[in-house]
Amino acid sequence: MVMYGENVPVHKKFVQYGMLKTELDEYLEEELGRAGYGGMRLQRVPNATKIIAYVERPAIAIGRRGRNIRRVEEEVQERFPLLGRVSIEVKELPSPELNPRVVARRLASALERGIHFRRAAYGALRRIMNAGAKGAMIILSGKLIGARARTEKFMEGAVKYCGEPGDEYMIEGYVQAVTKPGAIGVTVRIMPPDVELPDELEIRPPEEVEDELKELIGKSEDEAEGA
């Protein structure tokens, strides 16, 4: 996606592009949060930038006769001129229970309605695992009960905390719930069903391995003869 002048250093282009994506994502979160916004993707098309927004309820995001999404397109074009002409395509999230942002927003809404934090967290955790996740962790930080702030963690399945595995295999969402006692930070981390962990071994039948070895040996012999 070419959006910057030719004289701008490459590393600065990457930084600026990252900042633009973050700001755009935050803006769409504000505008499409009620529709269950779960993230976006940028695509460069001829003479324009296409934004694919993934939401839980597309009808709410689009609005009556497309008015809401047209308004968002106009505001994005005005606020982010580097994107050029903007078109937004709204797509439905295939599995909202596996999107940490959607889950965090639902959990925050439950806390704001006065549902006990343990009941709300365990309910969210159960729905995540029932959707097929390999693992999940929910962290609630703030005034959960009483005047003193505290942190509670809820986990199930395989969870990677930090380092490269944590960054590569876990996806994260964060939302802040505003309750009467005070603000509560809601962090949801999910390991998707399709993640292949490095410590997971596949034991294959001997006959299958033997067939592959024979095929490789045959190819090696053919190459040797050809040389």
UniProtKB/Swiss-Prot annotation:
Q: Which domain of life is it from?
A: Archaea
Question: Annotated Gene Ontology MF terms?
Answer: rRNA binding; structural constituent of ribosome
The answer, when asked if Cell cycle is one of the entry's keywords, is: no
The protein's UniProt keywords, in alphabetical order, are: Ribonucleoprotein, Ribosomal protein, RNA-binding, rRNA-binding
What InterPro entries does this protein map onto? KH_dom-like_a/b, KH_dom_type_2, KH_sf_prok-type, Ribosomal_S3_C_sf, Ribosomal_uS3_arc, Ribosomal_uS3_C, Ribosomal_uS3_euk/arc
Q: Which residues form the KH type-2 domain?
A: 24-94
Renumbered residue ranges of the record's region Disordered:
207-227
What are the GO cellular component annotations?
cytosolic small ribosomal subunit
Q: Name one GO biological process term.
A: translation
Statement: the UniProt record of this protein carries the keyword rRNA-binding: yes
The job of this chain, per UniProt, is described as:
Binds the lower part of the 30S subunit head.
Family per UniProt? Belongs to the universal ribosomal protein uS3 family.
Q: How does it assemble?
A: Part of the 30S ribosomal subunit.
PANTHER family listed in its UniProt record: 30S/40S RIBOSOMAL PROTEIN S3 (PTHR11760), SMALL RIBOSOMAL SUBUNIT PROTEIN US3 (PTHR11760:SF32)
Protein name as it appears in the record? Small ribosomal subunit protein uS3
Q: Which organism is it from?
A: Methanopyrus kandleri (strain AV19 / DSM 6324 / JCM 9639 / NBRC 100938)
Q: Which gene encodes it?
A: rps3
